[in-house]
Each structure stands twice: as C-alpha cells, then as structure tokens.
C-alpha cells in the first residue's frame, strides 16, 4: 500500500512539472522552438501568448 502512495506522488510530480512547459519561453530561440513568433506589444486575436521574447514588451505568440 505504501508503494501505491509513493507511485501516486511521483506521478503527480511528473504531471504537474510538465503541464506548464510552454510558459517558460523567455527568448526568441525558445519561442521558435515552441512554434511561436515574437510580436511587439500584444498577440493578435487568432494567437495566444506562451511567453516573452527579449523582455516583457515583446510577446511570444502561437496559434490557438
């Protein structure tokens, strides 16, 4: 029974770490690797923000 609890905790840790993977985009190279483009100010309506490029003003956007 203790093994089940350990495996459940490990599974939770792995799944929670992978869920926000694209939110770590912080430069133009990682933006392109995540199939995004760098756009100044705001993402267009057909795209969503997945991170930033070169600072907070330039957004990394990807199609919805």
From Swiss-Prot:
InterPro entries: Beta/alpha-defensin_C (IPR006080), Defensin_beta-like (IPR001855). It is found in: Secreted. Disulfide bonds join 31-60, 38-53, 43-61. GO terms for molecular function: CCR6 chemokine receptor binding; chemoattractant activity. One of its GO terms (cellular component) is extracellular space. Gene3D superfamilies: Antimicrobial Peptide, Beta-defensin 2, Chain A. One of its GO terms (biological process) is killing of cells of another organism. Keywords: Antibiotic, Antimicrobial, Defensin, Disulfide bond, Fungicide, Secreted, Signal. In many of the exposed epithelial surfaces including conjunctivae, bronchi, colon, urinary tract and trachea. Pfam families: Defensin_beta. The keyword Glycoprotein does not apply. Residues 1-24 form the signal peptide. Belongs to the beta-defensin family. LAP/TAP subfamily. Shows a broad spectrum of antibacterial and antifungal activities. This is Lingual antimicrobial peptide. The gene is LAP.
